[in-house]
Amino acid sequence: MPIRKSNDTLFYLFGTIPVIWLALLLAQSLGGGLPELLRNLTAALEQPTNIIWTDKSLPTILICLAAYGMAVLLYRTNQGRTRDGEEHGSAAWATPASVNAQFAQKESIPLTQHVRLGLDTHKHRRSLNVLVIGGSGAAKTRSFVLPNILTANTNYVITDPKSEVLLATGGYLKEQGYDVRVLNLVNLEQSDGYNPFRYLRDEKDVLKLVNNLIQSTTPKGSHESDPFWTKAETALLQAIILMLFQEAPEYEQNFSMVMRVLEYAEVREEDEGHVSPLDLLFESIERRKPDSVAVRQYKVFKLAAGKTAKSILVSTAVRLAPFNLPQIQALTDHDDMDLYTLGEKKVALYAVIPDNDNTLNFLVSLLYAQAFQALYYSADQIHHGPLPRHVRFVLDEFAAMPLPGFTRELATMRSRSISASVIIQNMAQIKELYKDSWETIPGNCDTILYLGGNESSTHKYVSEMLGKATIDTKTHGQTKGKSGSYSTNFQMSGRELLTPDEVRKLDNRYALLFIRGASPVMDEKYDLMHHPAISHSSLGGAAPYIHHGTKPPIYTGRPLLRVGGTENPNPLKGEFH
């Protein structure tokens, strides 16, 4: 629009030249009546270059320019009230080639078969956040996830349902020099270790961990009539984890130890004054550190009466029940994730989750929350700016995992060289997850890729994003009888580029692409089998990648909780120090 306005101004300025020329011819023709003026003007037009300056030339020029200016002003005023050809909308399709020319760079991410988005966000001024929408069978993995990972030009944190992506791409990333790390909740024996305690720098991080743990283990859509129980569990967990963080040796800072400490929290309903082994431990800490935050939070828990305290303990133990499983204890007793290096060197972190069970998915939620914290810390406190390597979160099956605070991170990650590809089946999923704030997700994704689906609210959403175009319509009318007549009328009306029904019937070979500030594109989905690196993938003939997790190290040191004798059958009578 500013370019068009500039061109119009030049056009009107050039229009003053013929106006001045006509004014000079008119000035030398003035004199006598109207018939003489017409004869003189006709003679002057026969010799248009023979101009004579008279005393009437300047006033005539000024009068003609004033009239010309008023005419232009009147025309522009009327034009400002209309948009020819856009009365009902100006939406139009862009060609894949034109959009690719605007946004593609040497280092880019593939979006469709013919459109790429460059990694240098300062050039095109768009974030790399992508919202991918596609129902089952819409080729979300084959046309988006796998091509992007095989491009291997950023670091990756990947949600991988069923281990399909790890098998197909892990080997190639290894060849490209990536450090491949895996949290495998499908085959726990093939998982690297992840211990959330390793990323606690101070007491504030402990509070974040407990808050994320509570939110991640709360069933989706549950509504508590009384938040007392959740708050009481929170206080107890804060006390125990703070105590381990401040007092225990490194090898006892894990959730296995949290479960063991919970066993020492003995409560007797009939004896309110009963002192449990855990009470004794916190009393000993209070004598040495009267201002301990752990002790203060434990006192909050102890405000509950005997029966209530027992219910809190049971509820907390049930919430943390997965940490009683030997496989989960082995996985969380040590750490191989090294989250602080995610943006420092070539790293690909896979979070393999089952697609038919979400029991352990809270571990991935904790991992991602701490990954964001570690990356933000590295960018803000170490590099004081963007990370050395761009980190992309490829969040397949996004709705399967609660990510507390994700909308806030999505809005702030760009300046730190972090981006997210949020992959959902339909808009109803994020509406259910984020209720009143769901629009912040598409609002912070400068690119939206629609691959197809069969959910009606998504069809309507996509149709509205496409917008309306102004089209010509033709109507026919006919009256019969002796004085019958037939008429044809032409008029303009508005029409969506695609109606919701047409969005539903979109050919499965095609995708709709929206990049902020550009017209929408309909293009073929990316053909994985034509990717330059497909021969290095298991889908192109290479061997599937099998990850072998590390074994937990053997720790030595003085334990926080020590049993008095090796033959003592009752650890509750052990010695605290």
Give a label for each model feature.
Residues 89-97, 106-107, 112-122, 142-143, ...:
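A broad, low-specificity signal for short, low-complexity segments enriched in glycine/proline
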Residues 89-91, 112, 124, 128-129, ...:
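General secondary-structure edge motif
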Residues 32-33, 81, 86, 90, ...:
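Intrinsically disordered, low-complexity regions
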Residues 1-138, 142-145, 189, 468, ...:
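Basic- and hydrophobic-enriched, low-structure N-terminal and domain-boundary segments
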Residues 410-412, 416-512:
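Conserved ATP-driven motor cores of ASCE-family P-loop NTPases powering translocation/secretion/packaging/pilus
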Residues 126-418, 433, 501-525, 530-533, ...:
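P-loop NTPase motor domains
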